């Protein structure tokens, strides 16, 4: 990997991928929509080039892909914009092919797997999405894998669970930390008794960059699981205890979400995804750990402590 481009570098995964590339001395282009956000994240890094571009536009994507050999695609959209995922992938792949990019890595989540058929979900688990958003994510994956099969470039998919941590305030978990620090009641979607897993977002950067650096890891999908299986209730309790507060939270179920959806477009998108909170979706990353000789995972106690410390320094 001589030079990489991070598509979606303004997000939390992209930020920590960029920090790891810089740590390794690998030149990279940080691409996102907002120049000020990118400059804040990467402007002082010696190996970073900041490019503000509209990645839904062919010209913007072409500018972003020019002169790099590897694209690490971490671009995300809101729930109300999910139909854009396949379109954005087509634009990025066209740009990559035209620019002669050699490798294209997609970072995604667990939606394409659907409801688990096994206790742990390995890369060989069938992809049978049960939600429209899962179907759109599967379509995105299929487009990339088909490009790899056609020989346009080498491809890879890395799947992550829900994450939390510094700069991840758009995640499901981070608002709970904010509520705990303020002594307020946290909101959660769905039941809290189900086993879940969470990834401390800084842990993702080194793993993604290591995979991207290895030619023998392409042509495959890789799971990177969270620190451990934990009930959402236990996770929330740990957050409040670390903040020195008594746990306070409320949950919204399917009926409440449908009512809220009458007034809020985002809430309208949530009921179909409740299966992720009602059924344990726990990744099996034995293949990845075996390939890389292990992978560092920050414990929940340590990750929660670091996240609270970061939020105290970044109160908004």
Label for each model-derived stretch:
Residues 1, 210-270, 285, 290-291, ...:
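Mid/C-terminal beta-alpha module of Rossmann-like enzyme folds, strongest
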Residues 90-136:
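Conserved Rossmann-fold NAD(P)-dependent oxidoreductase catalytic core, especially the SDR/UDP-sugar
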Residues 130-157:
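Active-site Tyr-X1-5-Lys
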Residues 150, 157, 161-195, 239:
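NAD(P)-dependent short-chain dehydrogenase/reductase
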Residues 197-204:
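A conserved structural motif in NAD(P)-dependent oxidoreductases
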């Amino acid at each position: 990997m001589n030079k990489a481009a991070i598509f979606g570098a303004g997000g939390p995964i992209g930020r920590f991928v960029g920090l790891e590339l810089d740590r390794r001395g690998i030149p990279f282009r940080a691409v996102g929509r907002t120049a000020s956000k990118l400059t804040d994240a990467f402007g002082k890094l010696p190996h970073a080039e900041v490019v503000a571009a509209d990645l839904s536009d062919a010209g913007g994507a072409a500018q972003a892909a020019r002169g790099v050999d590897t694209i690490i695609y971490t671009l995300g959209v809101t729930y109300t914009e999910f139909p854009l995922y396949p379109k954005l992938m087509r634009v990025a792949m066209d740009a990559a092919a035209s620019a002669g990019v050699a490798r294209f890595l997609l970072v995604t989540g667990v939606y394409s797997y659907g409801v688990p058929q096994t206790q742990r979900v390995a890369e060989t688990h069938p992809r049978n999405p049960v939600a429209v958003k899962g179907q759109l994510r599967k379509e995105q994956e299929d487009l990339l894998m088909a490009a790899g099969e056609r020989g346009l470039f080498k491809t890879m998919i890395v799947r992550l669970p829900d994450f939390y941590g510094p700069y991840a305030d758009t995640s499901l978990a981070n608002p709970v930390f904010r509520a705990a620090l303020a002594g307020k009641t946290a909101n959660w979607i769905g039941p809290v008794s189900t086993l879940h897993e969470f990834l401390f977002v800084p842990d993702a950067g080194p793993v993604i960059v290591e995979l991207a650096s290895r030619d023998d890891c392409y042509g495959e999908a890789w799971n990177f699981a969270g620190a451990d299986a934990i009930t959402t209730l236990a996770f929330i309790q740990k957050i409040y205890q670390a903040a020195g507060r008594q746990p306070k939270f409320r949950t919204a179920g399917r009926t409440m979400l449908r009512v809220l959806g009458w007034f809020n477009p985002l809430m309208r998108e949530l009921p179909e995804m409740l299966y992720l909170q009602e059924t344990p979706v726990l990744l099996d990353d034995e293949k990845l750990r075996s390939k890389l000789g292990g992978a560092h995972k920050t414990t929940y106690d340590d990750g929660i402590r670091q996240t609270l410390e970061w939020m105290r320094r970044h109160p908004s």
